[in-house]
Amino acid sequence: MVDSGLADFVLPELPDLELEIDEHHRHKDVYDHTLQVLDRAIALETDEEGPVPAPDLTLRLAALMHDVGKPRTRKFEPNGKVSFMHHDVVGAKMTKKRMRALHFDNHLIADVSALVQLHLRFHGYVDEPWTDAAVRRYVKDAGHLYHRLNRLTRADA
């Protein structure tokens, strides 16, 4: 879609990811990373009996949009590192705006935007052990999107 130029008209946020280098994924730009996350998310969908039956438009759109906030939040730190603070929150707002412009259903917009905003929640507990309260908070915040959020997080790892 980006190579053909179609993204400029449908999802103009995607071409902006091509030259954004994420320090956690130095070997690829954010666009390539996004395509890998999308492929992984599709692979994590379940059959009709599972919690995330394929094809799952919600999970796929969340995977596609999960890092769209990075270009707007990129900051060069004094130590030479690059940060994307709050790209999850900014990305969720951008996702909501784009999906509204494309006339998606309000429930789908809410779910995809929530997944984009929550996609880093699990990573906040990587360096510390999870407390019972942290587990309850994660499950509560994910709500009905719990299985999708787990798959999105795993695809983004």
Residue ranges and their predicted role:
Residues 2-45:
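Long, charged alpha-helical interface segments
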Residues 16-17, 23, 40-157:
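C-terminal subdomains that position terminal phosphate/3'-OH groups for nucleotidyl transfer/ligation
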